């Protein structure tokens, strides 16, 4: 589902003014930043690591290239890209939320990743980079939180080099009906309780479940990427469509 009008958008199942959403999302991630990695492992049973590995494998990133890990949070993808691009390459970890960015910087520095990684607080809708800067852009579990997704996709297209590719890893729509019902039960009844127990914030994980349901489905997101200028757009359903990886190119 896309935004309802030019003035309003959705925050989970709520309809809010567009200018309010960024602050509301920021509050969510300020709240959960300290327990973000732990909760990712718990709520996905560790499978998020396989989804991210598949994203890396599909990226085609090589030594010496320049990568933007957008909404990069605690740096899972940045850590892997740093090793792939080597000393002659560069990885930019960008996130709109300073709490998440600080967690990512601390985590990566603690494991010795310092030489080829830079950090920037940035809004996906207005990326502060020159045209044709990056060989690859990834946005992992971040697009659904963006207020104006179409504007963000156009911004990503602008800063990609010709021949570059965008990979969007995001929760999507299960393709098996019995799984969809079980997933709803888990998302709305169990996940907020786990969030309350571990992160002391059930409301933020209730928002997570709602934001997933409001996010465009596989075919809709494919069309949005094409409308932004991307070509050869395809997607892969992971874990029966609970998550999908979309990939598109700039030629």
Curated annotation (Swiss-Prot):
Residues where S-adenosyl-L-methionine binds: 74, 95, 123-124, 140
InterPro entries: SAM-dependent_MTases_sf, UbiE/COQ5_MeTrFase, UbiE/COQ5_MeTrFase_CS
Pathway(s) the chain acts in: Quinol/quinone metabolism; menaquinone biosynthesis; menaquinol from 1,4-dihydroxy-2-naphthoate: step 2/2; Cofactor biosynthesis; ubiquinone biosynthesis
PROSITE patterns reported for this sequence: SAM_MT_UBIE, UBIE_1, UBIE_2
Its EC number(s): 2.1.1.163, 2.1.1.201
Keywords on record: Menaquinone biosynthesis, Methyltransferase, S-adenosyl-L-methionine, Transferase, Ubiquinone biosynthesis
SUPFAM superfamilies per UniProt: S-adenosyl-L-methionine-dependent methyltransferases
S-adenosyl-L-methionine keyword on record: yes
GO MF: 2-methoxy-6-polyprenyl-1,4-benzoquinol methyltransferase activity; demethylmenaquinone methyltransferase activity
HAMAP family hit by this protein: MenG_UbiE_methyltr
Function description: Methyltransferase required for the conversion of demethylmenaquinol (DMKH2) to menaquinol (MKH2) and the conversion of 2-polyprenyl-6-methoxy-1,4-benzoquinol (DDMQH2) to 2-polyprenyl-3-methyl-6-methoxy-1,4-benzoquinol (DMQH2).
Family: Belongs to the class I-like SAM-binding methyltransferase superfamily. MenG/UbiE family.
This protein's name: Ubiquinone/menaquinone biosynthesis C-methyltransferase UbiE
Species of provenance: Klebsiella pneumoniae subsp. pneumoniae (strain ATCC 700721 / MGH 78578)
Lineage of origin: Bacteria, Pseudomonadati, Pseudomonadota, Gammaproteobacteria, Enterobacterales
């Amino acid at each position: 589902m896309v935004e309802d009008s030019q003035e309003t958008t959705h925050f989970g199942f709520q309809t809010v003014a567009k200018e309010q959403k960024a602050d509301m999302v920021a509050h969510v991630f300020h709240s959960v930043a300290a327990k973000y990695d732990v909760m990712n492992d718990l709520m996905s049973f560790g499978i998020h690591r396989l989804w991210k590995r598949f994203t890396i494998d599909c990226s085609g990133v090589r030594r010496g290239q320049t990568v933007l890990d957008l909404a990069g949070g605690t740096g899972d993808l940045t850590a892997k890209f740093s090793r792939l691009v080597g000393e002659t390459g560069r990885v930019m970890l960008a996130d709109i939320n300073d709490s998440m960015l600080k967690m990512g910087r601390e985590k990566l520095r603690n494991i010795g990743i310092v030489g080829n990684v830079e950090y920037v607080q940035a809004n996906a809708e207005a990326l502060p980079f020159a045209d044709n800067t990056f060989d690859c852009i990834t946005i992992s579990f971040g697009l659904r939180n963006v207020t104006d997704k179409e504007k963000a996709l156009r911004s990503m297209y602008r800063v990609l080099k010709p021949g570059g590719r965008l990979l969007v890893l995001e929760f999507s729509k299960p393709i098996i009906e019995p799984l969809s019902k079980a997933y709803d039960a888990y998302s709305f009844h169990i996940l907020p309780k786990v969030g309350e127990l571990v992160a002391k914030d059930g409301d933020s994980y209730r928002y997570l479940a709602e934001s997933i349901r409001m996010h465009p489905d596989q075919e809709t997101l494919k069309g949005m990427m094409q409308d932004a200028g991307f070509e050869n757009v395809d997607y892969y359903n992971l874990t029966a469509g609970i998550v999908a990886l979309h990939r598109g190119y700039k030629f």
